[in-house]
Amino acid sequence: IDLPGHSRNIASVHPEIRCNYPPDTVSTNGYDYRSAWCVAREENYALLTDILGELCALFPSEYIHVGGDEVDMTQWNRCPDCQALMSRRGMTDPHRLEDLFMERMAAILAANGKRPGVWNEAVTTGGLSRECLVYGWQSVKACLDATAKGYKTVVMPGEYFYFDMRQTPQEEGHDWAAVFDAKKVFGFDFTEKGFSDEQMRNVVGLQGTFFSEAYVSHEPEKPDYLDYMCFPRICALARIAWRGNCEGWDAYYRELTDHYDRMAAMGIRFRLFPPKVSYKEGAFTVVADDGSEIFYLEGDSPEEHRYTGPVKTEKPHLYRFLTRYKTGRSPYVADKSYYRTLAPAVTITTSMGESTQFPYTNASAYKGLARTRRACRQQDWILYTYEQPV
């Protein structure tokens, strides 16, 4: 549930909830991609009263999270009805429209005996009631701001606690918030981040997050990918949430490896830290410090060979190494020459124009998503030009 933005799905069923202006459908191949509820349309609140009323009856929790993040307020700026509402209320900032919308949501929830949970953007102005429970996801600063304004806050900044983020640059997962492993999770410290004693009184706790759409393409009928992404990061999260990290990483790492047997007994497909790999004088030397066994793969073969000593080769780009311990496994680690072959230099051109927000250099640098300016039509093309044959 996310209001008033992120609502394209319900808008496709109830297009009348959108703002009152003709959308740009040329660049979207005929689709209306507007995703925000019109704040000025009174009928919208009747629909939401019905939806949230049923939701509140289903769930016994004190809080119902109603969202509030990533609202495309340009839609409100273009809507004559929303602009008229702002004028009547003496508003100049569209964030005040979100305040108004969320106040209506809070009233609906209160009528059903519930309190609202919201993302940190919903309290940008500080205008919402302190009855709201804030989930600070955008950054540590967002959590600092919310607690300073007096909001009870669940601290969950993406760069530390979004477990759908990849753990090294070569692994699977998102990377828009950060690339991090359990060591960085353990390194989060409220004092170092600048939380005062007064702000700490507004911290409800820490929370880890994994968004399910990141799971759909990874055999969701099996827990392997979810386990790998969450464990042992979730162990480090629990540790700092309950006891802090004053003893330092080295001491905790020894404690963490004791959890391996527990996780294996529970059938958890956890992630091991990658082994340390060096290639010198024509041979690979590999070390693992957690008692796990080391294996290597050569070329395209899926066969794993047990590492028993230095591996001699004049073709280091063909080798990958990993470790295993019961149900746990590490990511693959390779020589830098291997990654050069996976990320060959390339230039991207197309007939569809380049998005300014997601330029082609994101893709050509292997650092993120790139988009065209419009959808594909007949005779359109995308060309990848490599500096060297691949």
Model regions: which residues?
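Short, solvent-exposed S/T- and G/P-enriched segments that are highly enriched in secreted/extracellular
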Residues: S301-H317
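Flexible, acidic glycine-rich loops studded with aromatic residues
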Residues: P116-E121, L128-C132, Q138-T285
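Disordered, acidic Ser/Thr/Pro-rich linker "stalks" and the adjacent N-terminal cap
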Residues: A334-P389
